[in-house]
Amino acid sequence: MIPVIAALNQHFYLEKVCKHLRHLFPKVVSYNRLVELEREVAIPLTLFIKKVLLGKCTGIRFVDSTPLRVCRNQRIHIHKVFKGIAQRGKCSMGWFFGFKLHLICNEKGEILNFMITPGDVDDRKPLEYKTFVEFMCGKLVGDKGYISKNLFQRLFVDGIQLITKLKSNMKGALMSV
């Protein structure tokens, strides 16, 4: 599992895992082969993390998303590993090609749930799925990208209060804290 996570940074994989952690991974593969194997390992790794490594729901939760770039924008047309799955998306840092990692964490920083979607999926979309917010109640804090009246009402019915900062052009709304 460590080599797969470390593959997100090629320099770390080549310098740390292949050289200094070789005794822990005697059959370590080349970086190019590891990138090819990522697609096969993605689903089992996701299931393992969901079953074993998630934290406990304590009270206040935070939701956010981050891009997982699979290649540079100039190489989209020759990319093969996630062809047909990865999509072009936009984040605060500009355009990217890949996936979005949506995370819900508690105040201790423990991951409570996560979802990986194609890059073109709206940040609010995973919160609409019952499986993403199941076993949660209380307050959920998000950034301005999660503002949606329909989403707020849907989560409120499920016992989740979505808290976001208001945009500059919005009228103030009363919320109980």
Show where each model-derived region lies.
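Short alpha-helical elements
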Residues: 1-177
